[in-house]
Amino acid sequence: MVARRAIGDPAEALKSEASDDNAEVLIELKNVRKSFGKKVVLDGASFKIRRGEAVGIIGSSGTGKSTVLRIMAGLLQPDEGEVIIRGRPRVGLLSDEKDPNLKVGMVFQSAALFDSLTVGENVGFKLYEHSDLPEDVIKGLIQESLAQVGLSGVEDRYPAQLSGGMKKRAALARAIIKEDISENDNPLEEVVMYDEPTAGLDPVASTVVEDLMRNLHTENKAVSSYEEKKGGVASYIVVTHQHSTIRRAVDRLIFLHAGKVVWEGTSKEFDTCEEPIVRQFATGSLQGPIVY
């Protein structure tokens, strides 16, 4: 069944066949609203992100995609509604949480690397600033994280010496770096959030980034039992306009329009969906409910 509901319908969207209803809900938004001045950006958005999912958030420009990503990441507070993290309502921002129950990694559209720092210093920035780990241990974690994204040996370079695609991968390495190496540590699972990760990249560089996102997730899912392998990238969420990312890097889609969730479905259903707003977005037609 195609998961959809009409614009403005208060009923919950039907669940996609891609969803595993038995998987734990890691993040849930309930009737989230957010305005900036008089501009309403989110107008009652509700959806769930479950463990194991690769989710794309799509929709035309200005429909609240990046805003909802930042609210999920705990970087922005909603005006109304609830953000529930593994069954526990979040109060305040991520930085206010004393005992987080889910690690969140954020990869921004611009990569957001500090030009005056080396790649290694960028990747390990949080550890250098906020941990008591020895420098040699941090350097080891930096090398491990860079190796995961295919950037071994670049830690002494500066961002200006990297291509656009390499900068995106360095930003991902920063998002997934381990924060604690204690043998008795019970590492948190992580949800990685990408804000238009392939924007500005050529098709080949885009494919590299898309496959990397998928591979990091797949490697963690390869161990079927949660008890066997704690930590790792449990799920990821991508805000994107790119059809290649929709088809290559995600399994389920959430379509935002006018600050509401108007359709949910699989990436396969996206190509055949007859919902007018989805069809217009998929085909790039000027005719339809999306007005420019």
What are these regions (language model features)?
Residues 192-195:
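Catalytic Walker B motif of ABC-type/P-loop ATPase nucleotide-binding domains
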Residues 158-162, 166:
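Conserved ABC ATPase signature
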Residues 73:
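Helix-to-loop junction immediately C-terminal to a conserved catalytic motif
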Residues 135-154:
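Conserved ABC ATPase "signature" region
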Residues 117-125:
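Short coil-to-helix segment of the ABC ATPase nucleotide-binding domain corresponding to the Q-loop/switch region
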Residues 90-105, 135, 272-273:
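ABC ATPase NBD coupling module
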